[in-house]
Amino acid sequence: RDSLTTASKGRYGKEKAIQIREAARASIGSVMPAKSLELKHTIKLIQELASEIDEIEDSIQKIIDELNPPILSIPGMGVNSAAVILAEIGDFSNFSSPDKILAYAGCSPSTYQSGKLTNCYAHMEKRGSRYLRHALYNATKYVCYWNPVFAEYLAKKRAEGKHYNVALSHAMKKLVRLIYALQKSGKTYLTAA
């Protein structure tokens, strides 16, 4: 695969690369040597960073392969999401329930109370570990796509009239309960079902 196909995640191929090159040749470019040097330096930096990212992802893959966590058995759970979730939560015995993990991630509903007034439109708190919240959100989207049980649950919540993000937050709570159960029991998803 060429670098444009890789960088565009498969959206553009060789034809688009040729089209871009021809457009660049036909366009009016700067003849200043400083700009050319800056462009070469920037390209070199991008290539070095891409190489470092590949090394880090390889290291993460090796660590996850050694740990072999049960949450990877959930259809749709990716290695990077699993790594962030496990790293942010750490020791699952520090949490007495899945709700504590949700609160730690800042995914529990906020409450507003003043005198006799109680907030009836609770919003997600968005306190806590934003990395865990982001990883759980992304993992939930993929799990809902690849796992028929979660896809059905998300469709059910949408049929109840809930906004997509609200329905997804319900699926996220379900996913956290599943992750908690799998990690505590050591069972894989297929054997737990």
Where are these regions (language model features)?
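A detector of single, family-specific signature residues
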Residues: 1-193
